[in-house]
C-alpha cells in the first residue's frame, strides 16, 4: 500500500455457508434497505446506499466501521478508534472527489452517524457519513453516464481507486462477480442505488458462500480486521 500510495483499500473474502435454506427462502425472510434475488445466482440484503438522486441533488452515504452492539460502550469505542476514524476520513475525502466529477457545491452533511443492524448473531453498530452535491447540468438526465463515471464504488475498492483495484486483482483469491456491484432503481423522480454487500452467492454446484469485506489502512491489525469480516457474515432473521 505504501509503495503504491494507497491510503485505504477494501479487501474481501468468501466464507462457505451451511444452511438448509435456499436463496429464495433467504430472500423471503431477509430485512434490509434493499433485498434482491437474482435467479439462482445470489441474494443480497444490503444496508448501504450508494447514491440517491432527487431534484438534481446527489447524495452518497459511505459506510465504514463496524462493532458488536454488545461491546461495553460500543459507540464510544468505535468513535474513538483512530483507525476507524482515519478510514472514514479517507473515504469521505475520496467520495467528495468522486461527487465533484459529476456535481458542484459538494459538502459533508453528516460525519460518522450510527445505524444499528439486527442479525441472528446479535445487533451491530455501523458508522456512515452523508455527502451531497448539486448535479452538473450534463448529468441531470444521463444517469448512465454518471454511474459509468463513478463506478466501481469507492467504499468497496479504495483510495486512490485505480491503484486499489490493481492490488485487489493481485491479492484476492476469488472473483467478486456481482458482489460489491450496485443495484439501481429509478421511479421517474428519484433514482436510488445500493451497494451489493451482505451477499450470499451460489456456485455452479449449488454450494452457498457469503462474501464479506473490510477497509484496510496502514493502522490495521490483521486479527481485528479478520474478526470484523466474521461479524459481517450474518442473516437478518
Ranges and model annotations:
Residues 1-237:
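Extended alpha-helical targeting/anchoring segments
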